Amino acid sequence: MAVQQNRKTRAKRGMRRSHDALTTAALTVDQTSGEIHRRHHVTADGFYRGKKVIA
């Protein structure tokens, strides 16, 4: 098995973890119903960009 030769420093650990942060989902308000939904996704009642797309 692979075993590290030397211990990694706190700085190297932090550099590795610098890309691990989670981002919040981008939310927007629907033009028709005023409902909050994720960007580029259909609302729960079937509207997308102000138009009914799911009957």
UniProtKB/Swiss-Prot annotation:
One Pfam family from the record: Ribosomal_L32p
One GO molecular-function entry: structural constituent of ribosome
GO BP annotation list: translation
GO-annotated cellular components: large ribosomal subunit
Keywords tagged on the record: Ribonucleoprotein, Ribosomal protein
Family: Belongs to the bacterial ribosomal protein bL32 family.
Protein name: Large ribosomal subunit protein bL32
Gene name tied to this protein: rpmF
